Amino acid sequence: GTAGESEAAGFFGPELKMAGFDAIVFQGRSEKPVYLRVTGGKAEIKDATHISDLGAREVEDAIRDEMGSAKVRVAQTGLAGMNRVRFANITNNLGHFNGRNGFGALMGSKNLRAVAALGTEKLAFENLQFLRDTAREFTRTFKENPIGEQLFVYGTTAFAEILSAAGALPVNNFRRSSLDDAAPVS
């Protein structure tokens, strides 16, 4: 037992909220492969035996067909996760990945192939205009900053030199905290 975290971009989180959930806790292990369908404030465990050996795109297509909407957001582990490969990812909408801590393997250990969310509620914001203004300002500042541009183009590896110099670069699963020459990585 340990704790871990991982985050991914995309729209799965907002869709989960619009489906009526802030969070979901999974306990135990299913006897057979399953996926969780969440919509309209209800959660339903569905048999996933028919999709357990499919690739990610086929799984997403099958779940969307079953739920009757192309708007369904799917977070899933792949075959590596179902086989409990320790560094397996979770992908949502085939382009955003929770790659840290092997959470795909955690899903596989529970025989959980996917979580599918279809929102039916609108998100409510206390001050929507403030949120919009803040998002625009953040985006503008980010685009104008050369580091922000590097982050957009190269991802988090843009910070490899800075992190290495600070002794905060995770190398070999944190066995080391810097590289002798981080420049080629950045």
Language-model-derived ranges and their functions:
Residues 1-7, 11-186:
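Intrinsically disordered, low-complexity segments enriched in small residues
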